[in-house]
């Protein structure tokens, strides 16, 4: 797990991580039978990916981190918008 600036430990399992020269890509596989067309900002999957982005951002400070969900039943790739990630991180920080 990653140690957050406030001392809490973040644990989780990233399904796929691509460490590229100019960015970090984090991908999580989802097996929902009926994947949503859109994810609202307060969806638990957005919070999950925001947690990964936050931890990877601490580890790879000089590279942007992008997050996506791969729906295995569709198959479809959904990128999580940066503003949604920032909103979820702000929300997590506010509830601590």
What are the functions of these language-model segments?
Residues 1-96:
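Structural signature of nuclease core domains in nucleic-acid processing machines
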